[in-house]
Each structure stands twice: as structure tokens, then as C-alpha cells.
């Protein structure tokens, strides 16, 4: 059974907590489907080419129908001309969204957690809170404190997951390139797969791993 590593307030290992046994039997295909759904939903539908009705020009017949020895032509907007319209080109009314079931979303997230736990890259801490130092009625050194937390983990990049995240903690991590902090309500399988390590608050971890099969 896979386990998440429990860290103390100094981010040193002090124990472990088991993931639900049902996670072991989840198929990896659920994660593939969710990542495909996530990326397709984020795709901007901007590709657009003009057809022969949309290009400018073509108001008159380019040359006489007969007698010139050339193939007949009615308009320079025809796709056979350089600068003419495009046949079967891209349109900007295509919907790239791919449907995925609610159950598959949950299974994908659970599989991603299982993968992180097997790789010893899933960590649980009691609380993720950055308070900084109050100077002149302003909170300062927020990013410095957040960076110290990240450096103490000794990981390549890290996803931090909070339960009811406060504005100072969110602000503290916003300028760190190799970190991302999200509230548990925003957590998804794509984010779990995108980062090499994950640090979760204990409350957020319990919220995610609770049995939701009856919902």
C-alpha cells in the first residue's frame, strides 16, 4: 500500500500516512483521458482562413471566357489563384472540448496521487501558511519565507495544496518560478502530473482521499 510522507514543522520526515487501498487498482488510462480533456479545453480556437467569399477583390472576370487560349476563370478569388480563398481551411467555430465523466475525473486524480506516493514525492504537512514580517504596517519578506520552504524540500519543482488558502500565502508563492500553490478546490489530476513533487496540508489531504464513491 502506498504511503505519503508526513513532515514536521521544519519539513523533516516524521512518519507516513497510507493512501486508500482502492487507489492501487485504478487504471492509468483515466489520467490520460483527463490530461487530454484538460489541454483540449484550454485550447484557444483562433485558427482561421478566408474562403473565396471573404477575400478582397474578384469583382470582375479576369479575362475573356473564350479566345485567349487560357483556362476559363470567373474570379481571382478562386482557390486556384495565388491570393485567392482557401478551400476546406481552418474555421474559428470549432469546439475542441472533450467530454469526460465526473467519475473519471476523480479516478484520474486518485491515480495521480498514487503515482506520486509510489515515487516518494507526496508530502503532508500540518499547515502551509506564510505570514512574513510586519514592518510599517505592511507584511514583507513573504516570497523569501516561501522560497525558504521550497528550498528546504530539496525538490525540482513543487505543487503546494492548501485548505482555505489565505491571501498572504498565495501572494508569497506567486513570484516563485518552480512552485505553484492552489486551494484544494482547484486541485486536479493535470496539476498533480505536471509537478515532480506535491506538498499538501493535512486537512487538504484528508479532504481528497475521503471515500467519495457514494456521492
Swiss-Prot record:
Residues 56-71 have a biased composition (Gly residues). Gene3D superfamilies: 3.40.1370.10. Pfam families: Ribosomal_L4. It comes from the Bacteria. Keywords: Ribonucleoprotein, Ribosomal protein, RNA-binding, rRNA-binding. Residues 46-72 are annotated as: Disordered. One of its GO terms (biological process) is translation. InterPro entries: Ribosomal_uL4, Ribosomal_uL4-like, Ribosomal_uL4_dom_sf. One of its GO terms (cellular component) is ribosome. The keyword Disulfide bond does not apply. SUPFAM superfamilies: Ribosomal protein L4. GO terms for molecular function: rRNA binding; structural constituent of ribosome. One of the primary rRNA binding proteins, this protein initially binds near the 5'-end of the 23S rRNA. It is important during the early stages of 50S assembly. It makes multiple contacts with different domains of the 23S rRNA in the assembled 50S subunit and ribosome. Belongs to the universal ribosomal protein uL4 family. Part of the 50S ribosomal subunit. This is Large ribosomal subunit protein uL4. The lineage of its organism: Bacteria, Pseudomonadati, Campylobacterota, Epsilonproteobacteria, Campylobacterales. The gene is rplD.
